[in-house]
Each structure stands twice: as structure tokens, then as C-alpha cells.
Swiss-Prot record:
The active site is at C161. It comes from the Eukaryota. InterPro entries: Met_Sox_Rdtase_MsrB, Met_Sox_Rdtase_MsrB_dom, Mss4-like_sf. Residues 1-61 form a transit peptide. The lineage of its organism: Eukaryota, Metazoa, Chordata, Craniata, Vertebrata. Methionine-sulfoxide reductase that specifically reduces methionine (R)-sulfoxide back to methionine. While in many cases, methionine oxidation is the result of random oxidation following oxidative stress, methionine oxidation is also a post-translational modification that takes place on specific residue. Upon oxidative stress, may play a role in the preservation of mitochondrial integrity by decreasing the intracellular reactive oxygen species build-up through its scavenging role, hence contributing to cell survival and protein maintenance. This is Methionine-R-sulfoxide reductase B2, mitochondrial. PROSITE patterns: MSRB (PS51790). Belongs to the MsrB Met sulfoxide reductase family. Its cofactor is Zn(2+). The gene is Msrb2. The keyword Nucleus does not apply. GO terms for cellular component: cytoplasm; mitochondrion. It is found in: Mitochondrion.
């Protein structure tokens, strides 16, 4: 618990909602773009756009069953995007097998050192289960993606534990 709290203290906190946000890519196969405004749909519109499972996870902060996600064992090279708004979120280059049952990444796409200001994600404190965790949401549409924990591999020490159903994979072009 102390390790988690120390890790939380050193993290960048939320940007104000509604501000223009950068979601720039980095180099090879750049899939980033400047996001000019936050995507906001009604509950009914999200339900029309998404499958019931996608809606439950991304809009109601649900969690898919462990070891059930379609991207858990995906080893293709490419980019993982938000299933709701198509923002680039995680590169396959930062994906690893954590053994937890969900796709895991060591950092978000666009991270520069410890600076996540050019990524497609935001972190939010989640105390819903009675112990503090760091929720990961999409900057563009605020979709719940999963959580990040301070028990990942070097050099970041982070484990972004992300629901497959919240992602859309786009393979790199040859």
C-alpha cells in the first residue's frame, strides 16, 4: 500500500476536461493527431454505437473476465486505439505478458520519460473497491480502459492493465 501511495504522489494528475488535448504519435507509423475537443455522447448514443460488453466496460467502468479478452495473446505489431473514439492509446512495442489475464502495457503511446501529456490517456484515482487504485481513461471520450499499477517491468515499473473490449487494434502497415 505504501508503495502504491508513493507511486501515486509522483504521477501527473488530470487535465481540466474540455481543454484541447494533444494526442501526438511518436515517429515510426505515427498514428497520432491533435484532438481539438472532447467527444461527448448521450448514454443512448453510446449504447447504439457499442456492443453491450463494450458499453458496460467503457461507459459503466466494468471489467471483462480475466483471460477472456481477444487481445490478451495478440503479438502483432501495431497500435491499440480506443474502441469508442479511435484515439491511439498503446503501442504493441510496450505490450508484455503480465500473467494477470488482461493485456498489459509498460507505458502509454506518446509517453516521454515520465511525461504523459502527449498521450491519449488520463489517470484518475479510483476508490470504488475500498482501496486506492489508479483508473486509466481515454482523454478524448473518457472511456474507462482499465487501471495502472506500480508493479510492472523496468524501466517504467508500471503495469497498465487494460480491458481488451475497450481497445481496437490496428496492425502496422508493411
Amino acid at each position: 500500500m505504501a508503495r502504491l501511495l508513493r507511486a501515486l504522489r509522483g504521477l501527473p494528475w488530470l487535465e481540466a476536461p474540455g481543454r484541447a488535448r494533444g494526442c501526438a504519435g511518436s515517429g515510426r507509423g505515427d498514428t497520432g493527431s491533435l484532438i481539438k475537443s472532447k467527444l461527448s455522447l448521450s448514454k443512448a448514443d453510446w449504447q447504439k454505437k457499442l456492443t453491450p460488453e463494450q458499453f458496460y466496460v467503457t461507459r459503466e467502468k466494468g471489467t471483462e473476465a480475466p483471460f477472456s479478452g481477444m487481445y490478451l495473446k495478440n503479438k502483432e505489431t501495431g497500435m491499440y486505439h480506443c474502441v469508442c473514439c479511435d484515439s491511439p492509446l498503446f503501442s504493441s512495442e510496450k505490450k508484455y505478458c503480465s500473467g494477470t489475464g488482461w493485456p498489459s502495457f509498460s507505458e502509454a503511446h506518446g509517453t516521454k520519460g515520465s511525461d504523459e501529456s502527449h498521450t491519449g490517456i488520463l489517470r484518475r484515482l479510483d476508490t470504488s473497491l475500498g482501496c486506492p487504485r489508479m483508473e486509466v481513461v481515454c482523454k478524448q471520450c473518457e472511456a474507462h480502459l482499465g487501471h495502472v499499477f506500480p508493479d510492472g517491468p523496468d524501466p517504467t515499473g508500471q503495469r497498465f492493465c487494460i480491458n481488451s473490449v475497450a481497445l481496437k487494434f490496428k496492425p502496422s502497415k508493411p
